[in-house]
């Protein structure tokens, strides 16, 4: 044979996803993967990973930047905010009142870094220091006030369909149900509830927290999520930049699979080849 598999050139098709944009509060993004800035071993790793991910939204913990917490000194200046949209978050806030104050600081921080029209805030109200599970009541209270103040609120919540709908009704720009506890790497443990949220939401659904590897990112997107926010799985990987690239590819793959529509799950096999003309089968009578 002149042509063998070993000699053949294989090309991986790169899908054109430019028309499939993510829109949040009237602003459009090409990438459906958001990343964070925490837990990296160095700023160099962080910058390389964010670049490899192709993300356009990066979340920043306002309190840690404001207080120059260890590992966050100079963080605000470490990235090119002309190319990346900042998503200030209220991590570290245990009450609605704290989260509202920190959200206001985050908006001012974004303005100082050149994003004058940035009203985005990732809302986190977490009084639980062990499991880092969000407070649904405090989150709703803070969201109501921040929406009144003109914020585009992206609330981090348990995968609670009723809470997600209530937050949508008060004017939140997205809902962000957790896949499993923050940093746990347990993957998607709330699949049924996330499906319900996706089916009923009229705002983007962003799965946030718990994703540990690329297959779980693809799984979340296959459920119909509009986007993902992934930090620990990238930052704490042995090779963060490579994991960031894997997560980016998985996000695209999962999105395409959701749009394509998977086959139904059946209890019995269905042959993919014709059942006529089998060896040993009698010819049809003419």
From Swiss-Prot:
Pfam families: ThiG. Its EC number is 2.8.1.10. The keyword Transport does not apply. One of its GO terms (molecular function) is thiazole synthase activity. InterPro entries: Aldolase_TIM, Thiazole_synthase_ThiG, ThiG. Pathway: Cofactor biosynthesis; thiamine diphosphate biosynthesis. The active site is at 122 (schiff-base intermediate with dxp). It is found in: Cytoplasm. The keyword Transport does not apply. It catalyses: [ThiS sulfur-carrier protein]-C-terminal-Gly-aminoethanethioate + 2-iminoacetate + 1-deoxy-D-xylulose 5-phosphate = [ThiS sulfur-carrier protein]-C-terminal Gly-Gly + 2-[(2R,5Z)-2-carboxy-4-methylthiazol-5(2H)-ylidene]ethyl phosphate + 2 H2O + H(+). Disulfide bonds: none annotated. 1-deoxy-D-xylulose 5-phosphate binds at residues 183, 209-210, 231-232. Keywords: Cytoplasm, Schiff base, Thiamine biosynthesis, Transferase. GO terms for biological process: thiamine diphosphate biosynthetic process. Belongs to the ThiG family. Homotetramer. Forms heterodimers with either ThiH or ThiS. Catalyzes the rearrangement of 1-deoxy-D-xylulose 5-phosphate (DXP) to produce the thiazole phosphate moiety of thiamine. Sulfur is provided by the thiocarboxylate moiety of the carrier protein ThiS. In vitro, sulfur can be provided by H(2)S. This is Thiazole synthase. It comes from Synechococcus elongatus (strain ATCC 33912 / PCC 7942 / FACHB-805).
């Amino acid at each position: 044979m002149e042509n063998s598999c070993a000699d053949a050139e294989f090309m991986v098709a790169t899908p054109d996803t430019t028309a499939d944009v993510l829109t949040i509060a009237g602003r459009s993004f090409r990438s459906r993967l958001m990343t964070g800035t925490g837990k990296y071993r160095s700023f160099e790793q962080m910058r390389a990973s964010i670049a490899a991910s192709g993300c356009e939204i990066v979340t920043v913990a306002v309190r840690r930047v404001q207080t120059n917490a260890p590992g966050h000194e100079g963080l605000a200046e470490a990235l090119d905010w002309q190319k990346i949209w900042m998503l200030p978050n209220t991590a570290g806030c245990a009450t609605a009142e704290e989260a509202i104050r920190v959200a206001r600081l985050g908006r001012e921080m974004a303005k100082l870094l050149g994003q004058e029209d940035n009203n985005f805030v990732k809302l986190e109200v977490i009084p639980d220091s062990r499991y880092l599970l969000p407070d649904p009541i405090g989150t709703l209270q803070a969201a109501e006030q921040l929406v009144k103040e003109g914020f585009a609120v992206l609330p981090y919540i348990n995968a609670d369909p009723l809470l997600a709908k209530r937050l949508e009704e008060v004017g939140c720009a997205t809902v962000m149900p957790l896949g499993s506890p923050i940093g746990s790497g347990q993957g998607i443990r709330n699949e049924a509830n996330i499906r319900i949220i996706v089916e009923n939401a009229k705002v983007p659904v962003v799965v946030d927290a718990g994703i540990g590897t690329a297959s779980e990112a693809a799984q979340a997107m296959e459920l119909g999520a509009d986007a993902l926010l992934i930090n620990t799985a990238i930052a704490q990987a042995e090779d963060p930049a490579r994991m960031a690239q894997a997560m980016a590819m998985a996000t695209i793959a999962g999105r395409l699979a959701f749009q394509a529509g998977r086959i139904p799950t059946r209890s019995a096999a269905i042959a993919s080849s014709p059942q006529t003309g089998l060896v040993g089968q009698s010819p049809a009578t003419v």
